[in-house]
Amino acid sequence: MKLEESLKKCPVIKRGEYNYFVHPITDGIPLVEPSLLREVACRILKIVDFSEVDKIVTAEAMGIHLATTLSLYTDIPFVIIRKRSYGLEGEIPVFQKTGYSKGQLYVNGIKEGDKVVIVDDVISTGGTMIAIIEALKRAGAEIKDIVCVIERGKGREIVEKKTGYKIKTLVKIDVVDGKVVIK
């Protein structure tokens, strides 16, 4: 499959002590091939039931292309959790911390009773996902499913234990000796 093959070839860089893999799905570089994006979307569509979903929710920035593609396939609108405040009525600020960054995220466009699927590119520490889940619960949304394309580290387990929500992933990886390894 293209996703796994492309992961095996992607470069790994250091961000402080964090080994950061650089991949089209997670970083938009070096090049996002339509066939790779299509494969990822089709694989998500096979494992997530969108039939009772009102909105697809993703975090800025690297979930946007995933949510856009899924929205085009399903005709379900999507909401982007942004890194800056717009000051709109009902905006929900939420703090998130990852393995290499931290800061505020802002949720807009979610109403009480909305049925949502959360889509993200990668889950590694779980910090962003926990923040998103907490914000959506505060807004009164019903989380129908959660899917992350790439799983790395213990983030999925941490989120599931802390929130009670199961997270689906397409591929699990690790970084060993400066290379991505498929598990």
From Swiss-Prot:
GO CC, one annotated term: cytoplasm
UniProt keyword annotations, A-Z: Cytoplasm, Glycosyltransferase, Purine salvage, Transferase
Catalytic activity: IMP + diphosphate = hypoxanthine + 5-phospho-alpha-D-ribose 1-diphosphate; GMP + diphosphate = guanine + 5-phospho-alpha-D-ribose 1-diphosphate
Disulfide pairings: none
Biological process terms in GO annotation: IMP salvage; purine ribonucleoside salvage
Domain of life of the organism encoding this protein: Archaea
Transmembrane segment boundaries: none
A GO term, aspect molecular function: hypoxanthine phosphoribosyltransferase activity
Main location: cytoplasm
Family listed: Belongs to the purine/pyrimidine phosphoribosyltransferase family. Archaeal HPRT subfamily.
Function: Catalyzes a salvage reaction resulting in the formation of IMP that is energically less costly than de novo synthesis.
Subunit structure: Homodimer.
Name recorded for this polypeptide: Hypoxanthine/guanine phosphoribosyltransferase
